[in-house]
UniProtKB/Swiss-Prot annotation:
GO CC terms in record: HslUV protease complex
Name the record gives this protein: ATP-dependent Clp protease ATP-binding subunit ClpX
Similarity comment: Belongs to the ClpX chaperone family.
Any one Gene Ontology molecular-function term assigned to this protein's record: unfolded protein binding
General function of this protein: ATP-dependent specificity component of the Clp protease. It directs the protease to specific substrates. Can perform chaperone functions in the absence of ClpP.
Organism of this sequence: Cupriavidus pinatubonensis (strain JMP 134 / LMG 1197)
Gene, per the UniProt record: clpX
Record InterPro entries: AAA+_ATPase, ATP-dep_Clp_protease_ClpX, ATPase_AAA_core, Clp_ATPase_C, Clp_protease_ATP-bd_su_ClpX, ClpX_bact, P-loop_NTPase, Znf_CppX_C4
Gene3D superfamilies according to UniProt: 1.10.8.60, ClpX chaperone, C4-type zinc finger domain, P-loop containing nucleotide triphosphate hydrolases
Amino acid sequence: MAEKKGSSSEKLLYCSFCGKSQHEVKKLIAGPSVFICDECIDLCNEIIRDEATASEKDAAAATRSDLPTPHEIRESLDQYVIGQEQAKKILAVAVYNHYKRLKHLGKKDDVELSKSNILLIGPTGSGKTLLAQTLARLLNVPFVIADATTLTEAGYVGEDVENIIQKLLQNCNYEVEKAQRGIVYIDEIDKISRKSDNPSITRDVSGEGVQQALLKLIEGTMASVPPQGGRKHPNQDFLQVDTTNILFICGGAFDGLEKVIMQRSDKTGIGFAAQVQSKEEREVSEVLPQTEPEDLIKFGLIPELIGRLPVVATLAKLDETALVQILIEPKNALVKQYQKLLAMEGVELEIRPAALSAIARKAIRRKTGARGLRSILEQSLMDVMYDLPNYKGVQKVVIDESTINGDAPPLLMYEEQQPKVSGSN
């Protein structure tokens, strides 16, 4: 019972949990027909604190108990991404420091470590998205890719920036703790640059406005996400996701940024002793590593957003040699993938060195980088893959330079028969 009659006819109140009377404790708090004392409240708080600390430790351990070193991260990236050595080194250090910081979150320290988000600058098909995907797979953390061009300010038609966090939650079955240690890759970040470096009086709902909205997300905020997806409406409960420890990697081609950099560097090269190079002599890949925050501001990113992306890595345009390596060397190389597909039909695929070079040159002409390699190879093998299940006795398919250039179909080699070209009667 929470109350009993004493000898002096006064009602004695007792704690409903520990049974102590009001005279044995400092405070007794009343509820509907129940009471709780200050000692029981302290005990409950202690239990909650212990559970919170334990869950934080578990989450940190789940992030990665055996966090790979920068060298190990770099070696893993090498298995999937060809070239871009400096960018891989910068990313390895940044990601290692980020997750090392998360592992030590529960510990008391005088120095608070801030988050270092990453900005990747490089042409289309240079490996920006692949680098981010590979990092997430290596660290076994939730990962999502968002397209900055589809985002608008809240209240306008288009995707709200908080939709990014909703997609991240979907990728980890709505486990909030996991999502709060994930990686978000925001592609095409350069496409939301403001139209000029002077603030405009007109509304720019897909430019500076989106940058401002992203800024809050990147620096850390409590994002309200509808449970199990769906649209927001006032009478529903929201999942609260703290974005403070989510690693944001932003990437973009930044076409024209090299001109901004050259204008700045040309101003410094004045005087009799100055060495002035013509603009034509300077390759874009030579200029981009000289990127300074002022260049990005001139390009159209707001200073606050640049301040939240302190780690900047530039990726070079891939040349013919690098593209050929991409076709054959990585673990999931395109040539290996198509060889596996044809092996399922019991057929060997041979792509000759001249054909590999022709594929690389075609991708360079199309200005698609590594991204365009698959479509070129798919186009060259389309007829073969269509007809192969109907052919009997095919042992090998050979692709040479003429096939890639569209001058001749692939060569089909039969068991103990003469070679035959695909599609011939």
